Amino acid sequence: MTKFTTEEVRSKFITYFKTNNHTHVPASSLIPHNDPSLMFVNSGMVQFKNVFTGQTKRPYHTAVTSQKSVRAGGKHNDLENVGYTARHHTFFEMLGNFSFGDYFKEQAIYYAWNLLTKEFELPKDKLYATIYHTDDEAASCWKKIAGFGDDRIIKIKTNDNFWSMGDTGPCGPCSEIFYDHGEQIYGGLPGTKYEDGDRFIEIWNMVFMQYEQIDKDTRIELPQKSIDTGMGLERMTAVLQHVSNNYDIDLFQEIINFTENIVKVKIEGEAKFSYRVIADHLRASSFLIADGVIPSNEGRGYVLRRIMRRAMRHAHMLGSQEPLMYKLLPKLVDLMGSVYPELKRAESFISRILEQEEIRFKTTLERGLKLLTEETETLKKGNELSGEIAFKLYDTYGFPLDLTEDILKNRDISIDHKGFEEQMLAQKERARKAWLGSGESKTDQLWFDIKEQHGSTEFLGYTLNEAECKIIALIKDNNLVNDIKKIDTQFLLISNQTPFYGESGGQMGDIGTIFAKDSDIEVIDTLKYLGSIIAHKCILKKGQINVGDSANFSIDIKYRQNLRIHHSATHILHAVLHEVLGQHVTQKGSLVAPTYLRFDISHSKAVTHEEITSIEDKVNEIIRDNHEVNTTLMTTEDAVKQGVMALFGEKYDSEVRVVKMGETSLELCGGTHVRRTGDIGSFKITSESAIAAGVRRIEAVCGEFVIKLIREKDSLLKSIENSLKTNKNELVTKVNNTLERNKELEKELEKTHLARLDLSIEQIEKQAEDIKGVKLIYRHIENLDNKVLRQAAANLTNKVEDLIVVYITGNNDKLSITVAVSKAITDKYNACIIAKELSLFLGGSGGGGQASLAQAGGSDIGKLTNIHEKLYSFITAS
C-alpha cells in the first residue's frame, strides 16, 4: 500500500472525481449563510442544502469538494475529547462527492470502491460496509461491485444508518465503509459491543437521499434522488500513512514538531496531549478568524474563545510564558495556505487576534488556576467541584466551563452543572434588578435584549488603540436595524469588542473612526449601557454599514492621551486633598474631559488661596517625581484589605483594577491612565466653588492646557496693560486708583439720580394720584440701580403721611419692583403685600422687606401696561 501525504490524499480525491465529470466546488465559509440554525459548517453537504431541498439550482449535477469544517458546539461539542482521543478534532476537512439527481446508489458505491482499492490501493480484505437493515438495494450493489459476502455487509437498525435533514424534508439510508487497522488495535465491528474501539474506523459515509419525510407518519419516494458523501481527510490520511492516530499524520506532526522547537519540551507523557490540543486548536482558531469570527462572549465568538483559551491553557502547561499561538501561524499557513488562500490573505489579521487574545487571557489564567488548585485540594477522585466556584472561574477569570472540566478531567473530578446554571441565572437576575430605575426605562428592554443575546462588550483599550471588531447591533431612533445607508445618519453601533472606552467612572468616552470594507464612520462619543455594553455614537460618512460586518476600530490617540492625563491627575489630586484638607475629604463626583478635569469633594468651607497653592505644589511635585503607574487585577476583598479608595460612580465586579501611582495614590478604577506621572506634564487649578451644602468643586487643567492657560492669561494681562497705559509693575496701583475713582463717580451719579427723583411736598401733592384719600406715585424707570430707587422712594414717603410709591425698573424678562408706604398708613397698606401682589402679577414669585419698604421681582414685561389698574384695584379694595 502506497504512503500518501495529506496534500496528496486531498488532491487525488478531487482529481479522481473531476476526471469522472464532477465539478470541483471550492470550500464554503465556516459560517453557514443558508442555515441560521447551524453554528458552523460541519460537513460537506451544508453548502448544498438548498440544492438537495430543491430551493436552488446549480449549473452542475455532480460536485466534489474538500470542505473545511468545525464541530465544537451543540450536539457536536467534543471539545473535551480533542487531543486525548485518536480521531476527535474541532477543525477537520471533509472530502465529498455529490449527485443532484444524476447517479445513485450503484454508481456512488462504484466510485468509492474504485477510488479506495485502485487509486489508494487499500487491501480489499481490510474493508467492510454497513447498510440500513432494510436497504436490500445497497446490499446487492456491494455484492456486485466489491464481491462482498453477507459477513462483510453489516446491517444496522439504528438511525446511525438513516439520515434525515430534520423532522421533514429529504432523507434516506446510509452506507458506511470501515477500515480494519488490525487485531493489534482494540475494538470490534459496528453493531457489536466493542464498536467504540479504534480497530474498525469509518472512513467514508454515503447518504442515499431517496425519500421525503412529509410528517412523522408519512414518507414518500423522491422523484429526483441524490447522493451526499463524506470522507474525513485526516482519518483517510492516517490509514494511508499506516498510523492509527490522526495526530500522527504528517500535517499534525509538522505543527507539533514546530511547536516543540519553540517551547523546548519533549513530546512525551502528558505533554503529548498538550501538543495535540494546540495543533488542533490552532487550525480551528485560524480558519474561524479568517472567515470573520472574532473571540467574544457570545455565539460563535464565544466558541472560538473557548477553543483558543483551551489551547492557551495547554501552552501554559508546557511552560510557555509568552504568547505562543501566533508564532505557530506561519507554519500552518505554509502547510495549508495554498489550498485555502483565505488563510494566507488574512495571516496578519489572524496573527494579531491570536496574540491579543493570549495576552488578555494570560493575566487571568494563573490566578484562575491558583483558585482552582486551592478549591480542589481537599477533593478526591470522583468528587464534585461546586457550581459556585466553577461560575466564579467563568465570570471572574474567563474560564469557559469546559476548560475547567478539561483541567479536572485527569483527576476524575466532575462539576456541579446544576449549581453552575443556578449561579448564571442568579447573576442575570441581579443585573436586571440593579438597573431598575436607572433612568434608561425607555430603552432598558432593548439593552437587556442585546446583553442577553450577545453578552458584554469586551474592552481592549487598556492595551490597544485599534482593533478588528465585529458589528453585532445597530440602533437608530431607539430601534434595532440591520444596516445604515443614509450619509450623515447618527446612530449607535455595538461591537463584540472595542478599543473605545465607554463613558463611565467620570471619564468621557473616546472618539475616533471606524473603517469597514464599504464604509467610513466617525465616532463622536462612546457610551456604556447596563454597565458592560459599550455603544459607539456614530455618524455615517461614506458607504453603508451592516450588522455582521467586521471593521477596523481606531480611537483618536491624542484625545485618549488627554483623557489619560486628566484622569491620572484626579487620582493624584484626590490623594493630595487628603493631605492638605484632611482625611474627611471624600469624592462626590468627577468629570474627566480631554481639556480639563472636574473634581467634587465633601468639604464644608471654601478652599483658601493658600490651600490651593499648596495643593498645586504637591500635585506638581508628584508629577515631576515621575512615578510609575501600575495596574493590578485583584479581588474586591483584597483591594479593601489594602486600603484602596473606591471611586464614586463605579460598579465593581468581584475582580477589580487597582491603579497605583508610586506610594502616593492607590485607587479602584476602570479608566485609562498614563504610564508614568511625568506624562501628565503639569497641573493648575482654574476654579474652586460651592455646588451644594458641604460640597466643593475643583476644576483644573493639565499638560499642554496649562501652557495654553498661561498664554491666555498673559495675553489678557498685556491687553489690560495696553488699555490702562501702564506696565505690569504699575498695574496693581493703576487698577486700584481706577477702582477708587469709579467709586467716587458712582457716588456722584447716585446723588444725581436721587436729586432727579426727589420731590418737594408741594410737588408730591401735585404729581400724586389720589385714590380714596391715599396718594399714589407710580413710575416705570429703565435700568436704574435698586439702591437708588429704595432710597428715593423712602425719602418721599418720609415727607408725607398718606403716600404709596411704586418704582419698577428693568427690561426684557427681568423686572425689579420697589414699594414704599408712609408709616402712618402701613396698618392698612403693607409694602410687602403690595410688592408680592405685583410680583405674582408680573410672573415673579413674591418679595420681601418691611411694612414700609419692600422689593420684589418679575419677568412679564408685557403686563406693565396693566400695573396701574392692578394698583388701583388693590388700593380701593383695602
Swiss-Prot record:
Keywords: Aminoacyl-tRNA synthetase, ATP-binding, Cytoplasm, Ligase, Metal-binding, Nucleotide-binding, Protein biosynthesis, RNA-binding, tRNA-binding, Zinc. Its EC number is 6.1.1.7. Zn(2+) binds at residues 567, 571, 669, 673. It is found in: Cytoplasm. It comes from the Bacteria. GO terms for cellular component: cytosol. Binds 1 zinc ion per subunit. GO terms for biological process: alanyl-tRNA aminoacylation; negative regulation of DNA-templated transcription. SUPFAM superfamilies: Class II aaRS and biotin synthetases, Putative anticodon-binding domain of alanyl-tRNA synthetase (AlaRS), ThrRS/AlaRS common domain, Translation proteins. Pfam families: DHHA1, tRNA-synt_2c, tRNA_SAD. Its main location: cytoplasm. GO terms for molecular function: alanine-tRNA ligase activity; aminoacyl-tRNA deacylase activity; ATP binding; tRNA binding; zinc ion binding. It catalyses: tRNA(Ala) + L-alanine + ATP = L-alanyl-tRNA(Ala) + AMP + diphosphate. Its cofactor is Zn(2+). HAMAP family: Ala_tRNA_synth_B. Catalyzes the attachment of alanine to tRNA(Ala) in a two-step reaction: alanine is first activated by ATP to form Ala-AMP and then transferred to the acceptor end of tRNA(Ala). Also edits incorrectly charged Ser-tRNA(Ala) and Gly-tRNA(Ala) via its editing domain. Consists of three domains; the N-terminal catalytic domain, the editing domain and the C-terminal C-Ala domain. The editing domain removes incorrectly charged amino acids, while the C-Ala domain, along with tRNA(Ala), serves as a bridge to cooperatively bring together the editing and aminoacylation centers thus stimulating deacylation of misacylated tRNAs. PANTHER family: ALANINE--TRNA LIGASE, CYTOPLASMIC, ALANYL-TRNA SYNTHETASE. This is Alanine--tRNA ligase.
